[in-house]
Every structure is written in structure tokens, then in C-alpha cells.
Amino acid sequence: MKGYFNNEQANKDSFSGDWFRTGDVVVTDEDGDIFIVDRIKDMIKVKGYQVSPTELESEIRLAPGVADVAVIGVPHPQAGEAPRAFIVPSSEDVSVESVQEFLSGRLAKYKQLTGGIVIMESLPKSPTGKVLRKELRAL
């Protein structure tokens, strides 16, 4: 790959030697297979720790009565950012308190939803089904 045409700054920001920085966060399994698990731009920076929204969403989906969820980072005066969850319930029994109680022993303290929990009827999504996090940030 030769780079961006007439845009040296984009080349400096996007390339490291012959490697292109995609912004993807990946893991490698014991067989050497690579899996994309998140995006760097979506990572939440809490007190110097990188928190994966995907990891939090996976845990929240295990809570009884949760149909769908999205997590974003919101500004926090002491932590820099804090995770906030937007939850679509599958039953009327879901509450902010029930989700917090479910997560209390499952997540490290810095991964707790100190940015809050918002119960919604549906998440904003693109025509392809991708959560529109930008719209959630605007709420």
C-alpha cells in the first residue's frame, strides 16, 4: 500500500512502517487465529484503564430480562470517562437496580456502570443493524 494521496499527516497517523493501523482491537487464540473484538475509538478510558464496551455488553446481555444493550463512554469528572449502558428490556422486571445488582460481582470496580443505566424501548440502529453510538452520545 502506498498511502494517502497528498496527505502526509494521514499517512503518519495510519501507518507504522509497512503496517496499516486499522483501529481494530484483536485477540489471537491458541491456534493463531485472529478475531476482531472491538474498535480502538470505541474503547472507554476509565482512570487510565481501557474498558471494552463489547465486554460490558456481553456481561449485561446475561442479565435476566435484557433483550439488547449498547455501552458508551461518557465524561466523568474524576475518572475521565465512565461506562453508560443503554438497555432494551425483554420483560417488565428489568430495572436499573436489578442490572446493577447482577453486575456487582461480575465486573471489576472500574468497569462498573458509573455513567448510569438508561432503559429504552429500542436502540438507534443503521439499516444494517449496527448500533448508532453517535446518537446515543447525543442523548
Where are each of the predicted segments found?
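AMP-binding/adenylate-forming catalytic core of the ANL superfamily
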Residues: 2-3, 10-13, 17, 25-111, ...
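AMP-binding/adenylate-forming catalytic domain of the ANL superfamily
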Residues: 108-130
